[in-house]
């Protein structure tokens, strides 16, 4: 009887975790605009991605962070939905979020990126995709 009760509790806990997105899935961060870490990750992803694009002459920069979702694995995956635009900074310069501002009258794109951060703090951009302007 005790083993059956323990099994019911275990299965109930797993069901709650799955239903709330805690167990392996992404969970949306409601207060993402109040957390500067997410904006820093967005700038990291955008500048890293744009620097790797062939034929590109200027960094892209973040206009707005629209949505943040996190997934805990062996570290944390951050799935960020962003508005980006080409910046005034050439790729031959060093990217700085405070000085690399969006060019005037350029199209903004909505992009989704995933930044993976290990338990040691190492991070990399695992994907970066944009919809047409």
Swiss-Prot record:
Subcellular localization, as worded in the UniProt entry: Secreted
Highest taxon above the source species: Eukaryota
Domain Cystatin: 29-115
Induction: Blood feeding does not affect expression levels.
PROSITE patterns, sorted: CYSTATIN
Region forming the signal peptide: 1-19
Keyword Cell cycle: no
Tissues and organs where the protein is expressed, per its UniProt entry: Salivary gland.
Keywords linked to the UniProt accession: Protease inhibitor, Secreted, Signal, Thiol protease inhibitor
Assigned GO CC terms: cytoplasm; extracellular space; vesicle
GO molecular function, one term: cysteine-type endopeptidase inhibitor activity
Record function comment: Inhibitor of cysteine proteinases. Inhibits host cathepsin L (CTSL) and S (CTSS). Modulates production of various cytokines and chemokines in lipopolysaccharide (LPS)-stimulated mouse dendritic cell. Suppresses maturation of mouse bone-marrow-derived dendritic cells (BMDCs).
PANTHER family: CYSTATIN
Family note: Belongs to the cystatin family.
Protein name per the record: Salivary cystatin-L
Taxon lineage: Eukaryota, Metazoa, Ecdysozoa, Arthropoda, Chelicerata
């Amino acid at each position: 009887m005790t083993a059956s009760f323990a099994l019911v509790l275990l299965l109930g806990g797993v069901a709650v975790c799955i239903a709330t997105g805690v167990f392996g899935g992404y969970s949306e961060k409601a207060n993402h605009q109040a957390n500067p870490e997410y904006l820093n990750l967005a700038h990291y992803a955008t500048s890293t991605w744009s620097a790797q694009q062939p034929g590109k002459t200027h960094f892209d920069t973040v206009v707005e962070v629209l949505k943040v979702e996190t997934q805990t694995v062996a570290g944390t995956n951050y799935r960020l939905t962003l508005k980006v635009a080409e910046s005034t900074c050439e790729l031959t310069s060093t990217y700085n979020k405070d000085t690399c501002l969006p060019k005037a009258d350029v199209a903004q794109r909505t992009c989704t990126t995933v930044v993976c951060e290990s338990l040691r703090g190492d991070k990399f951009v695992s994907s970066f995709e944009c919809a047409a302007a």
